[in-house]
């Protein structure tokens, strides 16, 4: 997705997924300077490539084939999206937030690219370095970084999110043994400076 510049010079080459606490979602795509917003409907997975209308067509194709006997197995974005979407529709819906995160993690593990994976001549395929999950009801944001020994979360109900509050940061390059709630690892920091 080769979007033209936005936000003072940034170029977005990925899809942005937005979900509110009610579960309503939108997919934002930047396409040659145009912002396109899509309602994903019953699609529960998203990757950065290909463009959303093409991805919907690929998912519709695999929906007809079914996935009980065969799913695409490469590391390409479309194949990973098909696997994640299929499994998200074929797992138990649970009320327990911890179990829901565990189920989500297992689906994403199945659709990730192994860490340090590299194929020459395939610049659009890179290894998965992190996964994140949001519990919108309980306002917890989970992080699963491959170089960290566990996965952890920030409890947003315990963060000061008011205008003018201190910026807090968790330096994931220095924290490799986090598990569970990680609010105590947040440190005051200068605001994030974009690379552009």
Predicted regions: what they are:
Residues 1-40:
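Structured, non-membrane catalytic/scaffold regions adjacent to prosthetic-group chemistry
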Residues 9-12, 21-23, 44-196:
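C-terminus-biased signal that marks the final domain/tail of proteins
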């Amino acid at each position: 997705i080769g979007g033209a510049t936005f936000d003072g010079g940034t170029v977005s080459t990925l899809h942005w997924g937005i979900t509110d606490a009610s579960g309503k979602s939108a997919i934002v795509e930047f396409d040659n300077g145009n912002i396109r917003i899509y309602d994903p409907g019953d699609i529960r997975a998203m990757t950065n490539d290909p463009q959303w209308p093409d991805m919907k067509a690929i998912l519709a194709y695999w929906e007809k084939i079914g996935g009980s006997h065969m799913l695409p197995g490469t590391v390409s974005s479309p194949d990973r999206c098909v696997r994640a979407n299929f499994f998200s529709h074929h797992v138990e819906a649970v009320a327990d937030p911890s179990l829901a995160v565990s189920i989500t993690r297992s689906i994403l593990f199945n659709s990730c690219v192994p860490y340090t994976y590299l194929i020459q001549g395939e610049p659009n395929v890179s290894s998965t370095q992190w996964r994140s999950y949001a519990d919108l009801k309980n306002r917890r944001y989970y992080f699963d970084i491959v170089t960290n020994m566990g996965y952890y979360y920030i409890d947003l109900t315990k963060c000061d999110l008011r205008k003018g509050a201190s910026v807090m940061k968790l330096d994931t390059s220095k924290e490799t043994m986090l598990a569970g709630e990680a609010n105590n690892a947040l440190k005051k920091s200068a605001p994030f400076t974009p690379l552009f």
